[in-house]
């Protein structure tokens, strides 16, 4: 979501510069940022340590995706249906519990995680050909819903908006 706009700005940078995208949390990249091996990190958590700068570049919410002809998902996704479905999820980068699972656990509930994948892009591809659903940041969910012909649904839980930070040293 951010990357295409970011790359447009890099058109003005000398051609020998290279972009490498990694999936590590910013906290795990501190040494590389300090040493100049990593210039920027994107994360849902600010890095609040001396010498590091974190700027919120947007806030997000979550949406769930299902295939358009899903046999049990109506226009509105109920909590009961949400909990009864199998979920494909992104492999966690840290030991922090995902917001959606934290919100469920506070209510004594748990979703059925069937498949864990290493990349966001794998999620809609699996949803498109199965009865599983996935939950993603809203902007990404809208892009994937259009591209993969999926239906988007409001997550049937109260989940606060969350920040996305760009972090540098």
PLM regions: where:
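A late-sequence structural motif
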Residues: 1-2, 6, 68-74, 79, ...
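Short loop/turn segments at beta->alpha junctions
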Residues: 25, 78, 118-119, 137
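Central regulatory/effector-binding core of bacterial HTH transcription factors
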Residues: 1-49, 117
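Secondary-structure junction motif
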Residues: 2, 44, 72-79, 85-107, ...
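Beta-alpha-beta core module
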Residues: 49-60, 121-169
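Alpha-to-beta junction loops
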Residues: 33-42, 62, 109, 127-134, ...
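Short hydrophobic/charged patches on amphipathic alpha-helices used for structural packing
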Residues: 30, 34, 54, 79, ...
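Flexible hinge/capping segments at coil-to-helix
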Residues: 49-87
């Amino acid at each position: 979501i951010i990357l295409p706009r970011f790359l447009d700005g890099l058109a003005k940078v000398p051609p020998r510069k290279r972009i490498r995208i990694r999936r590590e949390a910013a906290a795990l990249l501190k040494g590389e940022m300090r040493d100049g091996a990593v210039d920027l990190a994107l994360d849902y958590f600010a890095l609040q340590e001396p010498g590091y700068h974190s700027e919120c570049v947007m806030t997000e919410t979550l949406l769930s995706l299902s295939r358009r002809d899903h046999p049990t998902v109506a226009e509105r996704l109920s909590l009961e249906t949400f909990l009864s479905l199998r979920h494909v999820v992104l492999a966690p980068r840290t030991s922090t519990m995902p917001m959606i699972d934290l919100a469920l656990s506070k209510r004594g509930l748990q979703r059925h995680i069937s498949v864990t994948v290493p990349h966001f892009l794998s999620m809609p591809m699996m949803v498109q050909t199965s009865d599983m659903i996935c939950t993603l940041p809203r902007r990404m969910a809208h892009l994937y819903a259009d591209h993969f012909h999926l239906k988007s649904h409001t997550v049937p839980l109260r989940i606060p908006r969350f920040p996305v930070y760009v972090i540098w040293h």
